[in-house]
Structures are given as C-alpha cells and as structure tokens.
Amino acid sequence: MGSGDLNLLKSWNPKLMKNRKKVWETEQDLITEQQKLNTRLKEIEKERELNELLNESSKDKPETLKNDLALKKSGLEWMYQDAKLSDEKEDYLLGKKKLDSSILNQPATPPVRAATTISASGAATSISSQKKKSKLLKDDPMSKFKVTKQQRRTPDSTKKRAMSQRGKPLSKPAPDLDY
C-alpha cells in the first residue's frame, strides 16, 4: 500500500528542493560576506601603509604641511578650500558672471585655506560665510522689518514722533508685542 517515502512529507527533510535552496542561499550569503570582509581588510592594510609612509615623510616637515597631509589623507580637504573660488564658480554656473580670457589663461593655483575668525562662542567661522550672512541680512525683508522695529523702540525717536503728531509727549511708549 504505502510504498512512498514519508520523509518527503516532512518540512525538515534535507532531500526536499526548498530546503536545499535555503541552504544554498545561506552559503552564498556567507561567501559574499567573506569576500566583502577580505576586500575591507585589504583596504585597511593599504590605509595603514599610507599612514606609515605619511608619518615617516612628515617627521621633519612643519606643522601646517602635516595638517594638509592629514586632510588629504582623511578626504576632507574639499571642506577647507577657499570659499572665494567656490563663489566665483557658483556665479559662473548661475550665469551671473562670464569668464574672462585672463581667468582662462591663468595656471591652476593650489587652494589656500580661508581666513578664520574666532567668534564670541569660541567657534571658528570663515570670513566669507560672515560676508554671506551680512549680505543675506541686508536683502532679507524680515530683517529690514526688525531693524525698523528696533529703531522705533528707541525712546528718543518715539517721543519725537509723538510730539510732532499731537504736540505733547507720551509718558510711556506702547510695548510692541512679538508673536
């Protein structure tokens, strides 16, 4: 009667194709993970060799050159490039400025670090970013509104306006409420 293999009916049977597929997929995942690990280990080894070479070569060099090498090594040198150069590129790309032949004929100069100032909070900010902020504040209508509001709040100007309008001074100016 029952000459069939009852193990084929069990979900855990290793002879079933779906179970073989699961095993094969996990093996492939392990193989790809091992390959990724090996490539990462090779990258780490290359970085170590580069660090050793840079350390040996920068022993007798000044501190600023060491900092430049460290930035190049870490891949962050693009963050510290001169903002003036990026502003010119931005203006050209936006169509605000056309390139002159004198600019095109100039040899490429290495980027110079932007001058920094230390603010009251102690954080170093670049001068160009301060110029951008001041330019934005001048163009911003809300900042103009706040400046005029500050000018109105000065006691001398409010008394003068009140006297010119009514002829007698106000005892206390009405407080401006900010919502």
From Swiss-Prot:
Residues 114-129 have a biased composition (Low complexity). Residues 99-179 are annotated as: Disordered. It comes from the Eukaryota. The modification Phosphoserine is found at S129. One of its GO terms (biological process) is mRNA splicing, via spliceosome. InterPro entries: CIR_N_dom (IPR019339), CWC25 (IPR022209), CWC25_splicing_factor (IPR051376). GO terms for cellular component: Prp19 complex; U2-type spliceosomal complex. It is found in: Nucleus. The keyword Coiled coil applies. Residues 25-57 form a coiled coil. It holds the Pfam family Cir_N. Its main location: nucleus. Keywords: Coiled coil, mRNA processing, mRNA splicing, Nucleus, Phosphoprotein, Spliceosome. Involved in pre-mRNA splicing. Belongs to the CWC25 family. Belongs to the CWC complex (or CEF1-associated complex), a spliceosome sub-complex reminiscent of a late-stage spliceosome composed of the U2, U5 and U6 snRNAs and at least BUD13, BUD31, BRR2, CDC40, CEF1, CLF1, CUS1, CWC2, CWC15, CWC21, CWC22, CWC23, CWC24, CWC25, CWC27, ECM2, HSH155, IST3, ISY1, LEA1, MSL1, NTC20, PRP8, PRP9, PRP11, PRP19, PRP21, PRP22, PRP45, PRP46, SLU7, SMB1, SMD1, SMD2, SMD3, SMX2, SMX3, SNT309, SNU114, SPP2, SYF1, SYF2, RSE1 and YJU2. Present with 861 molecules/cell in log phase SD medium. This is Pre-mRNA-splicing factor CWC25. It comes from Saccharomyces cerevisiae (strain ATCC 204508 / S288c) (Baker's yeast). The gene is CWC25.
